[in-house]
Curated annotation (Swiss-Prot):
It is found in: Periplasm. Pfam families: His_Phos_1. The keyword Hydrolase applies. Pathway: Bacterial outer membrane biogenesis; lipopolysaccharide metabolism. It comes from the Bacteria. Belongs to the phosphoglycerate mutase family. Ais subfamily. This is Lipopolysaccharide core heptose(II)-phosphate phosphatase. SUPFAM superfamilies: Phosphoglycerate mutase-like (SSF53254). It comes from Escherichia coli O157:H7. Its main location: periplasm. One of its GO terms (molecular function) is phosphatase activity. The gene is ais.
């Protein structure tokens, strides 16, 4: 009974934190919640969250060359020229509020190119585990975070990874477009989904 009460209190405490997060997000966006039920977290809100604890932001890669009529950057398995411009624009806006972060990507051309253009000059670490989009993704995130517990992390991955996380953590249907993202954090060995990143 005591264990149940402790668990219930912990759940209530976390729910209250999530409500507070949604309220904070509402200060920076016109709507605090996306239509998929995820809290909306814009750049300024993300910056405030990062002051409370390190954040993990996962982005879908930029526009794929093999699924677009736009000009390819180079390799057909990579991204388009438009994709590089979009990634650079996103990176500039992101870095204005969170300049210090470690950068990772899965081992595909499109994620590597997206991460490179997102943050020109920053060291990029390629990790093939970030291509695995089941429970394994959480182990990879926790491992990366444990290497530098006080650092923010940016990961470039794939739409099916983001879809899986949103469904698994919040029972939300999330169909990310290019460069859409999710905001997470690791606390006491557990990975939490805070909401959907909205670039404003």
């Amino acid at each position: 009974m005591l264990a149940f009460c402790r668990s219930s209190l912990k759940s209530k405490k976390y729910f209250i934190i999530l409500l507070a997060l949604a309220a904070i997000a509402g200060l920076g966006t016109h709507a605090a919640w996306s239509s998929n039920g995820l809290p909306r977290i814009d750049n300024k809100t993300l910056g405030r969250l990062a002051q409370q604890h390190p954040v993990v932001v996962l982005f879908r890669h930029a526009e794929r060359c093999d699924r677009s009529t736009n000009q390819c950057l180079s390799d057909k398995t990579g991204i388009t020229v438009k994709g590089t411009q979009d990634a650079r624009e996103l990176g500039n806006a992101f870095s204005a509020d969170i300049p210090d972060f470690d950068l990772y990507s899965s081992n595909t051309v499109r994620t590597i190119q997206s991460a490179t253009w997102f943050s020109a000059g920053k060291k990029l670490t390629v990790d093939k585990r970030l291509l695995q989009c089941g429970n394994e993704i959480y182990s990879a995130i926790k491992d990366l975070q444990s290497k530098a517990p006080d650092k923010n992390i940016v990961i470039f991955t794939h739409n099916h990874c983001l879809t899986y996380i949103a469904k698994d953590k919040r029972d939300a249907t999330f169909k990310p477009d290019y460069l859409d993202g999710l905001v997470m954090h690791v606390e006491k060995g557990k990975v939490y989904l805070d909401g959907e990143f909205v670039n404003h």
